[in-house]
């Protein structure tokens, strides 16, 4: 006797029903399946929305921590400047103290010599009285000499006392400065601890963010969105810069016309005005004529794969956190702030068509609209944005298209 499993029985039953034309798909069955699919779609959409909210929250926390690091870095710079000034004051005070101590030793030596002269001469009031009885004229001369020696000795003693008083004041000042120095060091240590804590929080947030963005497609979408946001921000910033330059050039032309009319002499522009006039020149042809904005090893080259089909539109240079970032050429700052994916970003406009971009910074040192010169410090290397180690993102754009920066820098 043959035994059939459940699946075999079901299969035979379906075959029989189909052969008899008794099995049909009713509208009720189709509607149920559609409802189930729609339910699954809604659940998936809800899940995606939840992930997006979590990602937005993490991005906000990341920006908050990086802003805190930026603030603490500024405080550390101020403390370092203050400490340098205090150390200079202590060094100056110590130098003055050594001069006073040398002066004290010399005064003591002169006073000792003077006392020795008086002692060896044997001159004293009782001797002078006896000489008056014997030879008044000689006694008078001896009296004047004795008074002179005594006056010199008194002046030496007074000078020595004054020097010793100055030494006491100087030592007190040094002790006070040393106390201030210790307080400043303590403050700096606390600031460094606060910075380390903020960096740890930043790293923790970044790790959590990377975990949520583990899927390549999610990261790819994020990178595309960041890239698009950067393009839009550049377009907006370029337009604003063009309008600002136009206003400034018109104002300069009016000043030049008015000044030449008033003085009947050719107008001599200021340093800033000359910088404005020279800002029309771009970066020129790619001849490796500029220095790198920061020294370090090249972690990613232009055109190498960043994620999926997205490629790096610039180079990434590894460097220690806090390393000064320098503008490669003169120009106008059109962006100085935080951008998702790029962290604290500075973009400098060179002429009408060229831009240089500096990202992943932990702090920026310039403002939008500011004219900068070649080699001027504009930021500090960091690991803001979506990068796990301290490095600088450096790119060049010409006529709105990213180009390989390696052709311009050496």
From Swiss-Prot:
Top-level taxonomic group: Bacteria
Cited PANTHER family: MUREIN HYDROLASE ACTIVATOR ENVC, PEPTIDASE-RELATED
Protein name: Uncharacterized protein HI_0756
Compositional bias annotation for Polar residues: 178-187
GO molecular function: metalloendopeptidase activity
Transmembrane feature ranges: none
SUPFAM superfamilies associated with the record: Duplicated hybrid motif
Basic and acidic residues compositional bias, start-end: 236-263
Biased composition regions of type Low complexity, renumbered to the chain: 188-198
GO process annotations (BP): septum digestion after cytokinesis
Biological source species: Haemophilus influenzae (strain ATCC 51907 / DSM 11121 / KW20 / Rd)
Span list, region Disordered: 178-203, 236-272
